[in-house]
Amino acid sequence: MVGAGDVVTGRDADLILGTYYANELLLRLMVPPGLLAGGSEEEKKKAAAQKPPTQAQISSLVEKVAKSYDLNVVENTTTWLFERNELESNKKIILSPGANGVRGEGVPEVGEVWGVEMGLSLGSGKCKDLDHRATLHRRTNTTYILKRPSSRQTLSEIVKKFGTFIFSLRQLDDEKAAKVGVVECVRGGVLRQYEPSGELDNSPVSRLLTTIGTLAES
């Protein structure tokens, strides 16, 4: 955490500045064509006729900003469309897709809410799984008959308290019992487990998450 009285210099300063400007660029690229803050009707019509940038174009432009500070985009940095009770909807933008082959799909449209993520690294930007216990989970739409009473009890508490939102095991009434109860839930696909990950060469990384709404003029 950088305090108000601290002076950041060197590569740490590059990371902070690069993240800020890359994020500002991404936020502007998220605006659907035609949503101008000002301008004549002719200018607005001309803007509305333009095509939105593709996923590849967005990723390429953000990477150019990162490279100007000698940084790399953290692979699979993902921006999601938010829907009611759903933080990871069917539309997403993936910056610097990794070797898993997953690609983004869709572009922002008027009347949507998005969670815009930006992550840059002083290192390679490649990720690795960390040897730490996973503590973050969320419920999926998968139906599975749980056999253990402890699993059913844990899932019941999760449904009542969190719905489909992400939660930490510490937020449950009995964390020790929850550690046992979630095992079958994860194995059966009822819960998604978020595995801890970090930078491949342990270099410093930055993360920003901005919630935006692409609203029409009122």
Stretch-by-stretch model annotation:
Residues 1-218:
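Active-site neighborhoods and metal-handling regions in enzymes and metal-associated proteins
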